[in-house]
């Protein structure tokens, strides 16, 4: 597997971030940077679930459509969505119109609306491993798809009635939200926001 490679500006990046401008911007400014706040984490949780079985680029390019369709991923607003809203979502070409994923998003919002402020943030971040125990990956082959922490997080979320989040999706969430820094050792973005 490949290590960091130079982008057009000559600075080394994770290879996956070089394929499109959308990926490059996401790689450089978002992925692996700490995300906090229940609504912000709910958005990432939902988008990671919608990505399941698809490319992340598909989700990135529809992210604004998702934000519009799901009331900016404000938990309290999505929790109030009705059957008419669900039908609207199923007809919205700006998002992924997968009934199971839409149902899970609406059900998850209803569950999370009953949690206290900051509870989702605290729960997710409680699974962040100690960075000192994780060596910087040198190649993409060194980056896991699942870890004991992501497996435990997925199990905990499921126990709390959060749907459509298995260990792989939980690990992708951990990567995207900065719980782990899986930028390659030589990548210019490694350590960003820490």
Q: What does each model-identified segment do?
A:
Residues 1-194:
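HhH-family (HhH-GPD) DNA N-glycosylase catalytic core used in base-excision repair
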């Amino acid at each position: 597997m490949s290590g960091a490679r130079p982008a057009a500006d000559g600075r080394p990046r994770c290879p996956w971030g070089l394929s499109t401008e959308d990926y490059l911007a996401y790689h450089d400014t978002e992925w692996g940077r700490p995300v906090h706040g229940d609504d912000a984490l709910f958005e990432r949780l939902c988008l990671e679930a919608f990505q399941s079985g698809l490319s992340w680029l598909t989700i990135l390019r529809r992210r604004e459509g998702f934000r519009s369709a799901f009331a900016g991923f404000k938990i309290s607003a999505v929790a109030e969505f009705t059957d008419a809203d669900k039908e609207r979502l199923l007809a919205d070409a700006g998002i992924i119109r997968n009934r199971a994923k839409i149902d899970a998003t609406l059900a998850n919002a209803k569950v999370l609306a009953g949690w206290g402020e900051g509870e989702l943030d605290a729960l997710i971040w409680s699974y962040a491993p100690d960075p000192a125990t994780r060596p910087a990956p040198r190649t993409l082959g060194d980056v896991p798809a699942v870890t004991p922490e992501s497996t435990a997080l997925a199990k905990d979320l499921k126990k709390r009635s959060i749907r459509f989040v298995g260990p792989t999706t939980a690990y992708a969430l951990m990567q995207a939200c900065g719980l782990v820094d899986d930028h390659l050792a030589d990548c210019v973005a490694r350590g960003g926001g820490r």
